[in-house]
């Protein structure tokens, strides 16, 4: 279920121009927009999407939920979720919550640059 959610988040970000400097953590792995991570080359699984094994979000930020899905972001997604008062981003947060809700989850910020999923 988490991989399906991760794929939907990735597709949504791509369609909105929000994919870049993002990492989605789930099931002990990470999907990143970056082709390398500390010198390790990721396995390319889609356009600008690289998979890394053995990644725990708690190793990278304090407010993470390795039991579901966590995500860190900079760039366009960071701006969209934190500059919500700009007209060009109207509804972005609600759209993303809607994706999580389909999986009986909701997300909340840990810091301004990361979020984690929790059961409804």
Segments from the language model and where they lie:
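C-terminal edge-of-domain segments
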Residues: 114-119
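Positively charged, hydrophobic/aromatic-enriched amphipathic segments
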Residues: 1-50
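Acidic, low-complexity, intrinsically disordered interaction modules
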Residues: 32-110
């Amino acid at each position: 279920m988490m991989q399906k959610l991760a794929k939907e988040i990735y597709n949504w970000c791509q369609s909105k121009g929000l994919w870049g400097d993002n990492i989605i953590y789930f099931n002990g792995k990470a999907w990143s927009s970056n082709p390398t991570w500390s010198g390790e080359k990721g396995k390319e699984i889609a356009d600008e999407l690289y998979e890394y094994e053995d990644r725990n979000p708690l190793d990278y930020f304090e407010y993470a939920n390795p039991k579901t899905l966590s995500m860190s972001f900079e760039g366009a997604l960071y701006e969209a979720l934190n500059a919500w008062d700009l007209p060009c981003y109207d509804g972005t947060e609600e759209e993303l919550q809607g994706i999580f809700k389909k999986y009986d989850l909701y997300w909340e910020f840990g810091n301004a640059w990361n979020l984690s999923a929790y059961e409804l």
